[in-house]
Amino acid sequence: MAEAAAAAGGTGLGAGASYGSAADRDRDPDPDRAGRRLRVLSGHLLGRPREALSTNECKARRAASAATAAPTATPAAQESGTIPKKRQEVMKWNGWGYNDSKFIFNKKGQIELTGKRYPLSGMGLPTFKEWIQNTLGVNVEHKTTSKASLNPSDTPPSVVNEDFLHDLKETNISYSQEADDRVFRAHGHCLHEIFLLREGMFERIPDIVLWPTCHDDVVKIVNLACKYNLCIIPIGGGTSVSYGLMCPADETRTIISLDTSQMNRILWVDENNLTAHVEAGITGQELERQLKESGYCTGHEPDSLEFSTVGGWVSTRASGMKKNIYGNIEDLVVHIKMVTPRGIIEKSCQGPRMSTGPDIHHFIMGSEGTLGVITEATIKIRPVPEYQKYGSVAFPNFEQGVACLREIAKQRCAPASIRLMDNKQFQFGHALKPQVSSIFTSFLDGLKKFYITKFKGFDPNQLSVATLLFEGDREKVLQHEKQVYDIAAKFGGLAAGEDNGQRGYLLTYVIAYIRDLALEYYVLGESFETSAPWDRVVDLCRNVKERITRECKEKGVQFAPFSTCRVTQTYDAGACIYFYFAFNYRGISDPLTVFEQTEAAAREEILANGGSLSHHHGVGKLRKQWLKESISDVGFGMLKSVKEYVDPNNIFGNRNLL
């Protein structure tokens, strides 16, 4: 069987790979399709396996899903990288990430990341405490108080249409009306949402959570929602930072949280065409893990890789840090299947490019759950690179670093990833450096610092650092590396070591945990991003950081805010810029309002300086007030027209974008 599958150009991964069935053919809405295919049989000798799941397979998956709802299944789900139904047994209910991972003060008084999941776990950070005290005015003796656990009596009651519930039970699709399940899916990870979880509660949350296990289940759910005029809000990994998952407070209909996490399989891999067909609920880390077993990868690595899903990537037009080699999500997607109130949207073939009018994929990508549910996607894959190497470059200042990145982009020789940190972000990263166990290593670090600051004359309070990641064929990587370092030298850049580069990337997946620690000590913090033409990058970065400082001072913030940025993606015509800002809110009566007003002012400054509304976080409800201005009245009207046709009764009523 395996040899036959390989000969056909498709290799199913795991026991769940499907090749279709008679039931699939009987359900085919186009009975002439088989005849047409027979007439062009010669063109399909190397065709891909059928993607559809049979009715029996859907039933089997529902049964298996029900079995894994028990707490005993949680450790297996945790290890595999899939998201269990009871997310709260693995993940924090009021913060980022896994329950076993958080920053604490250890017995030595040093900040340490608990657990064993990350390279930084279990290591003391000897200078981080001093950094947060000096930078943010934190007094570690004064902690905030927050709810220790979720009290079901504090949550809005579940209001569900009884006729709908009766019909739902007939489908055998798993569901829950429990308070903790509903609250867990009522939010993403904006500061506002996490603050509310710690200090209060949402005004509106989903009334019921549904767990489809395949495309056909989603069709049934959408049909029932249309029948009873209910509201559906899809959720994948729950990593939204745009209020995309928050329920509209004035929604009076039953709100369904359609959780795609149990739709988490790779349906097939086509090794001839280097594509994989996957269900939308598979997480990035699980997708990469399974593909790697067969020697492949997608190369798509957003910072939320651990928890975000393929469906979420498509619906928000996501970007990954290695897009210079593999592309953004719009470059990776070959085929999308989406269930809408009008029916199923998908193309009739999986050709690499078509000239068939406006690309319907671009109606789906970035739709943010407003038109339907993405159930499956075909994405490009590549062989796992044979060689990977990190690097870093120190520049005298941020401006020269930007000029270097611009030249690298112009020559189209950017490594898989290149990130340029401003001075404050460099110092922040340096404060997260773990304790050095070797005197020799400590001596070398001191020697490098002396060389850069004293011998080369770099000002420690001005220098900027770029981290680099190269991957591919070893010989080509080494040639590529030399080319990049030669360009950097022309802009005053000095090689700063492979270890510094590697550490910068290893911090990627733990940065989000720091906000939870900050909240315990009266600090509010957030990240946001934009993209801008090259000639606007330096001014935009400076003006946004100055605006944040000015806004905080005018609003009575007693300690100067932490405001920093990095250039995190490069393009021919511009770059993506990522900002962090945080402030100590002790003495402020309404810190959340101050924070939101400051963040909005920063966004206004971005737009005034020629930046985009968003590069990859999306619009959601957080940024939709600026969407019409960003895409024009006519463009906004086009989006509304699509919404009104595809979803005339606003079944997908999360109210993102419009």
Curated annotation (Swiss-Prot):
Homodimer. The lineage of its organism: Eukaryota, Metazoa, Chordata, Craniata, Vertebrata. Catalyzes the exchange of the acyl chain in acyl-dihydroxyacetonephosphate (acyl-DHAP) for a long chain fatty alcohol, yielding the first ether linked intermediate, i.e. alkyl-dihydroxyacetonephosphate (alkyl-DHAP), in the pathway of ether lipid biosynthesis. The modification Phosphoserine is found at residue 65. It comes from Homo sapiens (Human). Residues 63-77 have a biased composition (Low complexity). FAD binds at residues 234-240, 303-309, 316-319, 368-374. Its main location: membrane. The modification Phosphothreonine is found at residue 74. Belongs to the FAD-binding oxidoreductase/transferase type 4 family. This is Alkyldihydroxyacetonephosphate synthase, peroxisomal. It is linked to Rhizomelic chondrodysplasia punctata 3: A form of rhizomelic chondrodysplasia punctata, a disease characterized by severely disturbed endochondral bone formation, rhizomelic shortening of femur and humerus, vertebral disorders, dwarfism, cataract, cutaneous lesions, facial dysmorphism, and severe intellectual disability with spasticity. Residues 1-41, 63-86 are annotated as: Disordered. One of its GO terms (molecular function) is FAD binding. One of its GO terms (biological process) is ether lipid biosynthetic process.
